[in-house]
Amino acid sequence: LDGRGGDRIVRPLLAALDRDGGRALPMTESLLSRISGKDNPQMVLGAFEQRWQDPGRITPDAGRCWIALDRVRDPGNLGTIMRTADATGARGIILIGDCTDPYSVEAVRASMGAVFNVELAQMPEDDFLDLAAGWPGQIVGTALPASRDYRKVDYAGPLILLMGNEQAGLTPALMKACTQLVRMPMMGRSDSLNLAVATGVTLYEALRQRHPPEDG
């Protein structure tokens, strides 16, 4: 922090940090700027240990879904998906194969803090296929060749929502592991949506089905 430890907003943060055994280090604004990579940094920066879920502890949840991402490469997409996962109450995110780092600066910024609220796990494709083989509920994947409209699928849990790589989509093995393959209608000249947008649209359809809007 930049020396404003007496600030009314900062004081409770410092008290909580002290209770949990953390350390507070005062530093100059110029050093904060160098660490954050921003010309006008916030007056407080935090450093936290990365949290990863043990893949062996990924369990079905009837009321919430897991999001599985196949080789997602764009940190902005991943950060936005983490934010949407948190907003829709998803259980967590499974990163399959060679994915971008969810703890990179770009991903953390795009998540707007949601990186600390969702469970994250990573595994190779073969391990995910083993998980999928024993999954007791639906695995819904999005794919351009699919013929079923995403709005006509029952997203009852336990659910895995499987999303493909930004350029290549899902691998053939992952598509085969899905219980349903869905598409989104494209009414204009574009043939697909951005990965983060497509994930958000599908998550909110699943949320709408689980929690339909009240009358009035």
Regions found by a protein language model. Name each.
Residues 1-37:
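N-terminal positively charged helical leader segments and presequences
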Residues 2-3, 27-28, 70, 96-97, ...:
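Short beta->alpha connector loops at strand-helix junctions that form conserved
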Residues 37-63:
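Acidic/glycine-rich phosphate/pyrophosphate-binding loops and surrounding catalytic core
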Residues 46, 84-88, 102-115, 172-216:
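Structured adenosyl-cofactor binding patch, chiefly the S-adenosyl-L-methionine
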Residues 57-60, 127-135, 151-154:
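Short amphipathic alpha-helix with an adjacent loop that forms part of the alpha/beta core around
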Residues 63-102:
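Internal active-site segments that recognize and position negatively charged phosphoryl groups
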Residues 91-134, 138:
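Histidine/lysine/aspartate-rich catalytic loop segments that bind and position anionic ligands
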Residues 140-188:
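Active-site/ligand-binding-proximal alpha/beta "capping" segment
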